[in-house]
Amino acid sequence: MRFDLEPPSSVAAAHRIGVLLINLGTPDAPTPRAVRRYLAEFLSDPRVVEIPQAIWQVLLRTVILPLRGRASAKKYAAVWMPEGSPLRVYTERQTEGVRHLLAANDYQVQVDYAMRYGSPNIAQALAQFKRAGVERVLLMPMYPQYSASTTATAFDAAFAALTRMRNQPEVRTVRHYADHPAYIHALAEQVRHYWAQHGRPDFAAGDKLVLSFHGVPKRTLDLGDPYHDQCQQTGALLMAALGLSTLECRVTFQSRFGKAEWLQPYTAPTLRELGEAGVRRADVFCPGFTADCLETIEEIGMEVRDEFLAGGGQAFHRIPCLNGASAWIGALGEIVAENLQGWPAKAAQPETVS
């Protein structure tokens, strides 16, 4: 096996620490070609689609990519920001926020981000850490709830990159933070901030808050994936923080792909049913998405909104994701700091003479 070329080892670099924030990924441009390239990588991951690859690749290349590439490109174009993809823009802002927060608290660490699919990829980010002399790495997925199709595959990619290194860094992973008090606080603050600006739903009159998480096939729950339970846990803690009951707030799952049964209840049908039942206002918040992206801006903000209004609803509100909110940056910094304990991450304090 050939190993990657590496700089000479340096004892002076032995205490350098890197924190890598990992998100899902995004096409490089809202064009059919770029979207097809991104989807080909994403949907070829056996952690994402658990179908024998010999069968799946034929279907993917001959049917799915040709059909979905152009349609998905139109959706990406509808949400694209002047600075680029929303997911990349917000992830970059989060990275910069955590970097500044840790530096302000005397942490001497390098903070960067990578995408599981697309660029910059995880192997590239780890190689950049290596060139900078980093010998300890904290992998921090931007997925609060653990799932094999998100968290595990991000770790897979990182460990695959390590197999090509002669001089591997020490590695720690953050498995999940679905119930972390700082994360729950940041979620509650995001909802409260939105309501302070746009008015609080009239729950006494029947208005609803819907917490929409990304869906996964139901069989993954039956096979032992903890994702569903952690989503429910996050939802319950957020409801408690907001002082809401299950009559006022409910958990749903979105982004179903294919014909197999996924985690239920599904978001879009739920919103249509609420509209048909006479619910006047529905607010939708996506706690599992730490940055706004196609699934939150287009799917929730446009498609799900239309379902609710078509059902008879009158007022639909999509509450933005955590993005660069100060409470979320603080929560990220707190979670990272907890997982850096035991490593020489902080600047040495000068001794005082009494």
Curated annotation (Swiss-Prot):
It comes from the Bacteria. Pathway: Porphyrin-containing compound metabolism; protoheme biosynthesis; protoheme from protoporphyrin-IX: step 1/1. The keyword Metal-binding applies. InterPro entries: Ferrochelatase, Ferrochelatase_AS, Ferrochelatase_C, Ferrochelatase_N. The keyword Glycoprotein does not apply. Fe cation binds at residues 214, 295. One of its GO terms (cellular component) is cytoplasm. One of its GO terms (molecular function) is metal ion binding. GO terms for biological process: heme biosynthetic process. It catalyses: heme b + 2 H(+) = protoporphyrin IX + Fe(2+). Transmembrane segments: none annotated. It is an enzyme of class 4 (lyase). Keywords: Cytoplasm, Heme biosynthesis, Iron, Lyase, Metal-binding, Porphyrin biosynthesis. Its EC number is 4.98.1.1. It is found in: Cytoplasm. Belongs to the ferrochelatase family. Catalyzes the ferrous insertion into protoporphyrin IX. This is Ferrochelatase. It comes from Burkholderia vietnamiensis (strain G4 / LMG 22486) (Burkholderia cepacia (strain R1808)). The lineage of its organism: Bacteria, Pseudomonadati, Pseudomonadota, Betaproteobacteria, Burkholderiales.
